């Protein structure tokens, strides 16, 4: 059995930080990198269903980034489904096919959403235990999302997060880190939460751990 399985988007990211250029593997790559950096012993199954590329501009002066992308140059609508403890789906709202989600053989399932298209078929959320979404991309009725997802909708931002559980709402605050490269911060957050939840099964504590881990990782990378 795998500890974590990653589905959804894998991207070739071309990055411009002012006039400095670099390239990296993004989306699934960001989540995989974070999981392995905080817990190298994790058994991770990589099953990208859509592969594409993105051009990303970073402005460290105001800790922002923007991008244009073609996320679905290549598609595989029949990924291998292996038994795993926790499955995570990257960029759910940009997937051109979500049919594989109902076949996932996993104790827990989560997904995140990104800037771009709105998720049209919200019924797919009924398959999820957790949904991660940035406050920038929050175009939805939170109460509708909370009703659909099995456990929690976690809305995160640079200053913290709001965790909408079935029975309560938990607000977490953190110090904003100024003048940094925030690329991949949302992916780091999801990965850190997943690793903590696998160890503790505690939602609210895992949110706190995720914030602390992301702050540490961003400080180390900048």
Description of each model-found segment:
Residues 14-15, 162-164, 190, 218:
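Short active-site-adjacent structural elements
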Residues 2-6, 58-171, 201:
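Ribokinase/PfkB-type carbohydrate-kinase core domain
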Residues 45-49, 156-158, 173-174:
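Conserved beta-strand termini and adjacent loop/short-helix elements that scaffold enzyme active sites
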Residues 8-10, 136, 188:
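Active-site metal-binding loops of divalent metal-dependent hydrolases
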Residues 2-62, 70-73, 195:
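Substrate-binding N-lobe of the ribokinase-like
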């Amino acid at each position: 059995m795998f500890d974590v399985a990653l589905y959804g988007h894998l991207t070739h990211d071309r990055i411009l930080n002012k006039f400095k250029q670099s390239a990296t593997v993004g989306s699934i790559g960001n989540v995989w990198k974070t999981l392995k950096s905080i817990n190298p012993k994790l058994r991770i199954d990589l099953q990208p269903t859509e592969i594409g590329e993105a051009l990303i501009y970073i402005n460290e002066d105001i800790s922002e980034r923007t991008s244009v992308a073609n996320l679905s140059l290549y598609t595989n609508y029949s990924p291998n489904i292996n038994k795993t403890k926790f499955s995570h789906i990257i960029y759910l709202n940009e997937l051109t096919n979500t049919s594989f989600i109902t076949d996932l053989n996993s104790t827990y399932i989560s997904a995140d959403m990104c800037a771009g298209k709105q998720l049209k078929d919200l019924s797919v959320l009924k398959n999820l235990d957790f949904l991660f979404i940035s406050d920038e991309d929050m175009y939805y009725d939170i109460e509708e999302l909370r009703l659909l997802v099995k456990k929690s909708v976690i809305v995160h931002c640079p200053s913290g997060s709001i965790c909408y559980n079935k029975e309560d709402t938990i607000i977490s605050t953190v110090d904003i880190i100024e003048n940094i490269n925030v690329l991949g911060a949302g992916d780091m957050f999801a990965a850190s939460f997943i690793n903590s939840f696998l160890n503790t099964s505690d939602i609210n504590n895992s949110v706190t751990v995720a914030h602390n881990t992301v702050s540490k990782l961003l400080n180390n990378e900048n």
